[in-house]
């Protein structure tokens, strides 16, 4: 350890990884609604006769068409219903980890009394659930982060509001200015004592299990189809195909409601998959050691977190594409690249896939995960041959940290109208179905 400041930063990096890389069962936006509903039920102590759910436009977008684990159904009303009947209010993003078939049947009976609408709020991630029965009511609000409960009310009395309640731990919102650089991340991943980061191996284990499940056939079956084409000799059994197969299979299973958790990144299972499975595939293909895989995963997940800190929690930019940039960096290192080549890889990816929109969570996410994975491998292969997008083009800069900041600016400022129109289109579709 060269100095005290570095030791403190490395400690911060480890804390950040442990906070942002956590298990999550099901797509995280519907799970926020389920978690709010589970806490409402805990406060109310009985089954409600009327439930109102309000969400931000972005949460609506990511919850409209995605599968809810263990139900075989999609959508925010379903998430709220099973949150009431079987949600564990203390389980965070694994709120539905003990859901039973009987509780799913109970939830179906609640669907007619649940109304979901979009609320005009400043937070892009916002979920509010109000449950009522026989003159009693309970209200729970989650905002900023998927499990950050900021308000609990029972019969109009505030029980907890932000940090005011003793014993209630709430994660602070992230700083707008990331306290890290790519060079610092790479140095940490390669130099930190292995014993301090071996916990990241759980990401490989957990997301590999999800990929194995996805290969059985979920959602759009991208992973299964790609595997079948390898067997038919229509696709090569190479690094890029293996990475696409594993990544898309895990996403297939996750978005179709498989009852297996994903190791998430920055509050998203697909981001966790995109930051994990391409690296696992590369390590397997290249016969990397366990230590190399561990360090590569740390690099990938920290890069994904770093890039995400420049963006809103939810936006019009596909975050799986940016999380895969972490995988690209790690694969470049596994292929023998140094910091310069790792920088080239990220610049290549930003020059390639930075325009992929997020039009809500759903089965098509696995297509975007596989596309971003292929871009990660392609950009890595270019980078180790010192080929890269020149700084004279688009939003790419010679300074990779500046390029990342430019991407964040595009997401936070340039794509606001895009986000609004995506949400408007999706709301119009839903209203058309309701008529």
Swiss-Prot record:
HAMAP family per the UniProt record, alphabetical: UPF0597
Protein name listed in UniProt: UPF0597 protein ASA_0240
BP GO terms, sorted: L-cysteine catabolic process to pyruvate
A Pfam family reported for this protein in Swiss-Prot or TrEMBL: SDH_alpha
Sequence similarity: Belongs to the UPF0597 family.
InterPro entries according to UniProt: Ser_deHydtase-like_asu, UPF0597
Organism: Aeromonas salmonicida (strain A449)
Gene Ontology MF, one: L-cysteine desulfhydrase activity
């Amino acid at each position: 350890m060269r100095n005290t400041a570095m030791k403190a930063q490395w400690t911060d990096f480890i804390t950040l990884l442990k906070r942002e890389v956590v298990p999550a069962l099901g797509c995280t936006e519907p799970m926020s609604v389920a978690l709010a509903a589970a806490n409402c039920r805990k406060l109310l102590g009985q089954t409600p006769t009327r439930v109102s759910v309000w969400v931000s436009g972005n949460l609506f977008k990511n919850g409209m068409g995605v599968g809810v684990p263990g139900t075989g159904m999609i959508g925010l009303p379903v998430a709220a219903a099973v949150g009431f009947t079987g949600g564990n209010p203390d389980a965070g993003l694994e709120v539905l980890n003990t859901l039973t078939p009987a509780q799913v049947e109970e939830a179906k009976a609640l669907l007619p009394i649940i109304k979901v609408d979009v609320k005009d709020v400043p937070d892009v991630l916002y979920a509010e659930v109000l449950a009522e029965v026989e003159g009693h009511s309970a209200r729970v609000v989650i905002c900023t982060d998927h499990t950050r409960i900021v308000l609990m009310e029972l019969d109009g009395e505030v029980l907890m509001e932000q940090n005011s309640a003793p014993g209630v731990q709430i994660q602070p919102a992230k700083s707008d200015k990331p306290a890290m650089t790519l060079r610092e991340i790479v140095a940490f991943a390669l130099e930190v004592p292995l014993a301090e980061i071996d916990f990241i191996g759980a990401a490989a284990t957990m997301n590999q299990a999800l990929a194995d499940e996805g290969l059985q056939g979920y959602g759009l079956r991208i992973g299964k189809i790609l595997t079948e084409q390898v067997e038919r000799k229509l696709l090569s059994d190479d690094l890029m195909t293996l990475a696409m197969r594993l990544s898309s299979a895990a996403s297939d299973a996750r978005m179709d409601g498989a009852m297996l958790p994903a190791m998430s990144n920055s509050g998203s299972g697909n981001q966790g998959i995109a930051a994990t499975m391409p690296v696992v595939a590369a390590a397997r293909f290249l016969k990397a050691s366990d230590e190399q895989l561990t360090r590569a995963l740390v690099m990938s997940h920290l890069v994904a977190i770093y890039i995400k800190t420049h963006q809103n929690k939810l936006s019009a930019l596909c975050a799986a594409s940016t999380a895969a940039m972490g995988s690209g960096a790690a694969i470049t290192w596994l292929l023998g690249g140094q910091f310069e080549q790792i920088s080239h890889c990220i610049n290549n990816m930003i020059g390639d896939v930075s325009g992929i929109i997020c039009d809500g969570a759903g089965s098509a996410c696995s297509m975007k995960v596989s596309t971003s994975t292929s871009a990660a491998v392609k950009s890595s292969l270019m980078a180790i041959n010192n080929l890269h997008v020149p700084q004279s083009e688009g939003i790419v800069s010679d300074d990779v940290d500046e390029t990342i900041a430019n991407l964040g600016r595009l997401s936070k400022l340039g794509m606001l109208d895009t986000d609004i129109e995506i949400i408007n289109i999706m709301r119009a579709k839903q209203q058309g179905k309701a008529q």
